[in-house]
Regions:
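Long amphipathic alpha-helical scaffold segments
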Residues: 116, 120-217, 223
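Short, glycine/acidic-rich hinge or "gate" loops at secondary-structure transitions
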Residues: 239-251
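Papain-like cysteine protease catalytic cores
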Residues: 248-356
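N-terminus-biased targeting/localization segments
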Residues: 1-93
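Active-site nucleophilic cysteine motif
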Residues: 218-233
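Cytosolic terminal low-complexity segments enriched in Ser/Thr and acidic residues
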Residues: 107-108
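Generic structural signal for hydrophobic core residues of well-folded globular domains
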Residues: 5, 9-12, 26, 30, ...
Length: 473
């Protein structure tokens, strides 16, 4: 269980409720004299202390009221010691203690230096804090409470990414701080997260976490991966656009996105992919995803009757210009058979090898292609499916740590990744020539497809060849 918790934390998800519940249960077991953990409890202390006993002043988990009282008697040196301890634990684990929130609110009146220490900022983050100190303090005042302590990690990473230096970002966040929430959205937030500290605080916490951890977005137990990918992509590339989506959803209970020049309203659209209203999501996803889901489904309905896969038209309109208008698919949709597989693979090799840049946003997001520490060419990607460490069959196991991954990334060797791909988008103006992939390498990828998800989709020529090889004649 402890190993599983660390594996999940390594991916830095936004939603950590289940992880915190597991850590709390481990702490209860440790405190129970009737339970002997033995060597199985190794590694638990760091997890428990990161939440309930991070520094000397809260080592025995005294409660937030007692800890707040202790802070009033500390000098600047003691406060700095507390700030440094919390920041180190937060960046080591991705977990934030409720006591950390008490400290950060207390430090609002104690200058930028201690705030910077408590957030664990580098020179980049400190500069951003100094430039936008008033905004940062306002966001802490709104979003940071013991119940919403994870907002601290999101805020720290937001500052470290330099997001506030984008001209529209700061005004959009000021707007978010004064955003009136519709009664429906207030009810949804209170129902999911509780009435305390307030629905506005929960939403602001969600905004900070999503902007700071764009690769930590998860779809929950819902078939809404397209919407989750869109939120991640907008948070990663265009925070102002994401914040505008939040405004429309939280204030107006409606989002309008155009499809081929025609507006689609989430309020007027029929049901989406999800048959029930999702509740196991972060605060931003909770409000925005139902609207995006209905719009995405409506775009698909408007493609009925067109030849080919509807993602060709839907994805660029839904996600924005980051999803290229070029489109390749290796399945003939009508019969469901593999189609032009070699050209598909050569094209994918070409558009990824040439620039090692974003490729497309369908299914997962390809972030970069580069050599790993062992000099193996790997594809690093974002998967919104909550836990990226998955087994994709036939020995293809996705890595989330240990092969050069950054927090939130998953990766596979290039050949293995190509063998599981069936659609990608690209920029048609930068396609380049089909890659000169070696025949042996290409055959290895094709064999992996034939032996896994393509086994029931073999085109006629491959079926005949395989049958011929198997025949005793």
């Amino acid at each position: 269980l402890i190993e599983e918790i660390w594996r999940i934390l390594q991916q830095r998800p936004i939603q950590l409720d289940s992880v915190k519940q597991m850590i709390t249960q481990i702490a209860v077991c440790q405190a129970n004299p009737d339970i002997e953990l033995g060597v199985s409890g190794q590694g638990a202390d760091r997890l428990i202390s990161s939440l309930y006993g991070t520094t000397q002043a809260c080592r025995e988990d005294p409660g937030v009221a007692v800890y707040r009282e202790r802070l009033t008697s500390m000098d600047s040196g003691a406060l700095q010691y507390e700030a440094t301890g919390f920041a180190r634990a937060m960046h080591d684990t991705g977990l934030v203690s409720p006591y950390h929130a008490v400290l950060l609110r207390y430090l609002l009146d104690h200058g930028d230096h201690l705030l910077s220490e408590a957030l664990g900022l580098s020179s980049t983050g400190r500069d951003c804090l100094l430039c936008y100190g008033r905004l940062v303090r306002a966001m802490i005042g709104e979003a940071v409470h013991p119940q919403t302590a994870q907002a601290i990690y999101g805020l720290a990473l937001l500052l470290e990414r330099g997001t506030l230096y984008q001209p529209p970002a700061a005004p959009a966040l000021w707007r978010q701080l004064s955003l009136p929430l519709s009664p429906y959205c207030q009810e949804r937030l209170a129902l999911t997260f509780g009435p305390e500290p307030s629905p506005r605080a929960w939403l602001m916490q969600g905004v900070l976490c999503m902007l700071g951890q764009p690769l930590g977005v998860g779809q929950g137990n819902n078939p809404t991966c397209q919407s989750a990918r869109a939120l991640s992509m907008w948070a990663y590339n265009d925070p102002d656009y994401l914040l505008q989506m939040v405004v429309w959803a939280a204030r107006d209970d409606e989002i309008i996105i155009h499809f081929e020049g025609q507006p689609i309203s989430s309020r007027e659209s029929a049901s989406g992919v999800a048959t029930e209203i999702p509740l196991d999501l972060d605060p931003v996803s909770l409000l925005v995803v139902p609207h995006l889901d209905r719009i995405y489904a409506e775009m698909g309905r408007r493609c009925l009757g067109r030849e080919g896969d509807p993602h060709r038209w839907v994805n660029p309109e839904f996600h924005g210009w980051w999803s290229g208008r070029g489109f390749r698919i290796n399945v003939d949709v009508e019969p469901g058979r593999l189609d032009q597989l070699e050209d598909f693979l050569r094209h994918f090799y070409a558009v990824t090898d040439s620039a090692a840049r974003f490729v497309g946003w369908h299914a997962i997001t390809v972030l970069r292609v580069t050599l790993d520490p062992k000099e193996v060419m790997r594809v690093y990607f974002f998967n919104p499916n909550n836990d990226s460490g998955q087994n994709w069959g036939n020995g293809v196991e996705v890595s989330t740590a240990g092969n050069g991954e950054r927090f939130g990334e998953a990766s596979l060797p290039f050949e293995q990744f190509a063998s599981r791909l069936y659609i990608f988008h690209y920029d048609p103006l930068e396609r380049g020539e089909l890659a000169q992939v070696g025949v042996e390498e290409l055959q290895r990828v094709k064999d992996q497809i034939y032996q896994s998800w393509g086994v029931d989709r073999l085109p006629a020529d491959v079926l005949q060849a395989s049958n011929g090889c198997a025949s005793p004649e």
